[in-house]
Amino acid sequence: MRYHRIIARLVLLLLIAEFLLFFLSWLLSATLTDSVHPLLSSEGIRWFLGQFCVLLLRPQLIWLILLSMAGGCVWCSGIFRPSQLSFRRQSALRVSFVVLVMLIMIVALLVMMPQAVLLSSTGRLWPSPFSRALVPILSALAIITSMCYGLLSRTFTSLFDVYDSFRIGLQQMVPFLILYLFVVMFYESCLYVFF
């Protein structure tokens, strides 16, 4: 696929930029620039290796994983594929729409009721548990709706097909996950070196 080549080039550029940053930080610290923390020092190497996993563990990583699983489920269910709708698919689409509306109503009740569970302690929507869980909520809505459609329309014949759709979604997202890893590491390295 064409976007794989673009992502591979971006990853290569980020890798080169990371190596250049290692040597640039060392060079700038050697010229007695006080505001620069070198990555090629004992402190810098300890920071880089010791914080590597901690720096990558961000909500955005979980969001990418959840969205890729939801995307795979939606794609494999065939809910958006233009095709001649049989009676079974029309019925499945109607039931899935009803399920989606019910789920949206449940989420709305968890947000709009007085002293709602998903509001912050001050009663605000942003920031709140709802705003922090927005991507997981949207992913769950997409997964449940497309799973319902897929099982009713027989594009999913078993729960293994649903599981397989998650795998397919994750497989399609792997290049973006690799790009994410390199972007976060370069960004965090720049913050360490210069700030």
Question: Whereabouts are the PLM-identified features?
Answer:
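Flexible hinge motifs at transmembrane-helix junctions and intramembrane kinks/re-entrant loops
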Residues: 89-97, 108-138
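Residue-identity detector for glutamine
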Residues: 51, 60, 90, 115, ...
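Core transmembrane alpha-helical segments of multi-pass membrane transporters/permeases
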Residues: 57-65, 95, 128-156, 162-194
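Transmembrane helix-loop junctions in multi-pass membrane proteins
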Residues: 24-32, 79, 109-121, 148-158, ...
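Hydrophobic alpha-helical transmembrane segments of integral membrane proteins
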Residues: 88-113, 174-187
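Cytoplasmic membrane-interface regions of multi-pass membrane proteins
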Residues: 76-89, 151-164
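Transmembrane-helix bundle segments that line or gate the permeation/cavity pathway
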Residues: 1-84, 97-112
